[in-house]
Amino acid sequence: MTQPLMTMRGIVKTFSGVKALDGIDLTIAPGECVGLCGENGAGKSTLMKVLSGVYPWGTWDGEIIWEGAPLKAASVRDTERAGIIIIHQELMLVPELSVAENIFLGNEITLPGGRMNYAAMYQRADELLRELGISGINAAQPVMNYGGGHQQLIEIAKALNKRAKLLILDEPSSSLTASEISILLDIVRDLKRRGVACVYISHKLDEVAAVCDTISVIRDGRHVATEPMRALTTDRIISLMVGREIKNLFPREPHPIGDVIFEARHVTCFDVTNPRRKRVNDVSFALRRGEILGVAGLVGAGRTELMQAIFGAYPGVSEATVVMEGKPLKIRAPVDAIRAGIGMVPEDRKRHGIVPGLSVGHNITLAVLGRFASAGRIDSAAELDTIHTEMKRLSVRAAHPMLSIASLSGGNQQKAVLTRMLLTNPKVLILDEPTRGVDVGAKYEIYKLIFQLAQRGMSIVMVSSELPEVLGISDRVLVIGEGELRGDFVNDGLTQEDILSAAIRPVQRSPNPTVASAA
């Protein structure tokens, strides 16, 4: 039997008297890929921060055995020297530096006298990229010239340059296209063949199944199960993660669909850096009361820019006529949209959704503070009462509402941003990638909420890159391709192939869809 490369035993980590990890065990062998699964807030990232030295030895209880000896790392530097490398969900690259400079950051090759040996670094960086089978990256170019997919691969090259024996990948595909994900999974398989162990953290269970040998599930800070991947089904993994059986991930509920309530006409957006280039070109669509409208398309198609323009949040020049209940609106900024009954939960919650310096509660009430103001003062008791009520209603899990929102899991941050928008009582709610980076349990709760809102007569626009999600939730689907409307389909027998075909080619399957009700 192969000797373990790393063993964690009885790991306990406490924050303010609350156990975030409660006696967790984890073992991994050379060349093995372990999928670490669990809901947001289950303790996955905390466990990996213990392993990678972010939380140094002495700040947690238990033991880590590395290559047969106790590991007592005082810092990330110590674990990296040992060969344990973590690639975080938020990449740690310096955009202005070259690819090679990023790969060698902190481990630079120098000439006598201490000057940088750029020629040697460029050569070695090119070798690393070739070893990984990565093409299309020039080691001398700044990292900011490359998209998220290439940057993820640069991070892996950086890890290999540090002679990684154990590579921890935390949600590595959250911002990648389908083709980039395929390249990533091939690289993980190649690393396994070389004897590099991997811990793969992802909510995308198809990826976990594709590359992982073993699945380890944690729930509420406790180890639930470790089983071979071949013995598990997706439904079984979900059940272990959430502690209950979810038979239908998309809990469709009948909801009546009324007359047209909202129209966006001739929406056009110009590129921020190149004002001659159109990111969105003359897109028009209508939305009915109680309707769930999915918006699909390839990455970079202009879906987010379309929604930002409607909401008054597009950073560049945009043109649009927005009509609510037959009345044209003047939307110059998001505050105008909110006052008119339009709410939006943005794609990038960390940059445009949450305010990291504020508490969970203050993030929730940020858009409606005027409700609690009297004579220039805030009625804190009334505000706190609303916060408690709304957090309970949407199952926003936090030890206390006055904790920093930055301390919450991604799923709970998303629900807090959603709660804030719902407090504005929108008639139309735009959700841009509402389940990105959240676990299966949180996704299910968000889907249930979407159907509940539709039942109450709210109209929903949901942008998503996950086609099963679009098909499972939507009454109607818009397809955007290269900034243009490529299709407007009733979701009745619609397939992923139909959507992709429309995204690639301007094919109109149902030019004038009408929907009376959804079941």
From Swiss-Prot:
Keywords from the UniProt entry: ATP-binding, Cell inner membrane, Cell membrane, Membrane, Nucleotide-binding, Repeat, Sugar transport, Translocase, Transport
Q: Where is the signal peptide?
A: none
Organism domain of life: Bacteria
Reactions that this protein is recorded to catalyse: D-xylose(out) + ATP + H2O = D-xylose(in) + ADP + phosphate + H(+)
Q: Identify the Gene3D superfamilies for this entry.
A: P-loop containing nucleotide triphosphate hydrolases (3.40.50.300)
The molecular function terms of the Gene Ontology recorded here are: ABC-type D-xylose transporter activity; ATP binding; ATP hydrolysis activity
Q: Which residues form the ABC transporter domain?
A: 6-245, 262-507
Identify its membrane topology class: Peripheral membrane protein
EC assignment = 7.5.2.10
User: Chief localization class?
Assistant: membrane
* NCBIfam families, per the entry: PRK13549.1, xylG
Question: What role does this protein play?
Answer: Part of the ABC transporter complex XylFGH involved in xylose import. Responsible for energy coupling to the transport system.
Q: How does it assemble?
A: The complex is composed of two ATP-binding proteins (XylG), two transmembrane proteins (XylH) and a solute-binding protein (XylF).
Q: What is this protein called?
A: Xylose import ATP-binding protein XylG
